[in-house]
Amino acid sequence: MRRAGILLDVRSVAHGGQPGDLRRACIAWVNTLAGSGLSLWQILPLNPVDGVGSPYASRAANAIDPSLHPELAGDITVTASEVTAALESQPWLRRFAVFEALREVHGAPWTVWPLAIRNAGLNLDVTVDETRLRHHAAVQVALGRAWQAVQAAAAEAQVLIVGDMPLYVAEDSVDVWSAPHLFELDERGRAQQRAGVPPDIFSDTGQLWGNPVYAWAAHVEEGFAWWHQRVARLAELVDVVRLDHFIGIVRAWSIPGDAPDARTGEWIDVPGASLLSALDDIDVAFIAEDLGLVTPAVKQLRNERHLLGMAIHQFGFGGDAYAPHTPSLTPEDVVAYPGTHDNDTVLGWWTDADETTQQRAVTAGVEPSAPVRSLLQMGLACPARWYIAPLQDVLGLGAEARMNVPSTVGPHNWSWRANDDHMSREAIAWFGEVAKAHGRR
């Protein structure tokens, strides 16, 4: 089915700020989408954000961001028996609650905790304050119930929630602390090998992300149980999972832990086919974020698994090498975007584009007098099975509304928030009307 929808982080949804207001705003939002003839809501990861607001270097792969609790679930009462039942039935929740309780007492990162506590994660062989533990568990139970209400509204409105799974987790995370043998660590728990990407035309030194690289042999030995639990948990929260950095489950750029940048890394093979096969029994669809250095092996795995890939139309005017990202040449088996959270808004991109890029775009059909709407119209008309645009682009906002500038840190990232006017503007209705005209819903 040809579908269309909007990318909007849950944290960016406009709401009143009172307990439960964000939950009610999310429910209203899915009804707005459905009422506009749209059927996709893509979100950024729901996991806890890091110290600079990014959800892509989380301290917990299975938890919902506790900072969302007051506005999303602050009006929900959780009983002691519910907390006990959740702790007994969900092993990830006990690990997370113990980890959070220890962080409150000992601070972060866990790699500098006292030795006995540092080494206690695998079997949770540690004593923690029960009140703290149960508090963190109760917050997760409340968040889970709140999100279930949003999911129920989306299901009734026939809107699919498209989630996002970062490939890696943070070094200072419950995941690494509780399963250190699954990561390439030294004796103190610090990453011996770190993730990133090699130098390219955009960066002479590559990108050093800092996340610990997986000890893939250990994952194979355990039948990918850690991954199965992680994806099964995410499948409880969303209908579709975007596999971030899909090329990294075929081969990964592994950088020495003490390297100052990514230049000294090396490629390591990753058992991606076996990993995906281990997830076959989980009822969730995947989107492969196959951007970057796409090798024949990456293409082969995506095709074998019949996964939708991705196309970014802002990239489509850079010459022949970027032809698959050109709207009219976009393949059918992809999800197309004008840009994602890592790109500038369309208006910001157009404003900064050089003359050659603008001319190529105009030749392809972009109208200089209306670059945003014309590119969105081209996207909605393109062959891609699904088309998703950030809300900022549907609204025609400029670079000030950009969500993230990769490889930078600062208040300009992860801070954009919609207001009430944004959430109900006629632009959303226009987007839905054009989608319908091109056979999408």
Per-segment meaning from a language model:
Residues 1-9, 15-16, 52-144, 168-388, ...:
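Alpha-amylase-like alpha-glycosidases and glucanotransferases acting on alpha-linked glucans and related
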Residues 1-27, 31-37:
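Mature N-terminal, pre-catalytic/accessory segment of carbohydrate-active enzymes
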Residues 24-31, 145-153, 228-229, 371-375:
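Short alpha-helical segments and helix-capping/turn motifs at coil-helix boundaries
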Residues 24-49, 233-240, 381:
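Catalytic domains of carbohydrate-active enzymes, especially glycoside hydrolases
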Residues 34, 147-157, 280, 302-303:
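Surface-exposed amphipathic alpha-helices with a cationic face
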Residues 44, 160-162, 166, 240, ...:
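Outer-envelope exported proteins of Gram-negative bacteria
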Residues 137-169:
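Conserved, well-ordered alpha-helix/loop/beta-strand core segments that scaffold catalytic motifs
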Residues 416, 421-441:
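Terminal-tail/helix-coil boundary detector
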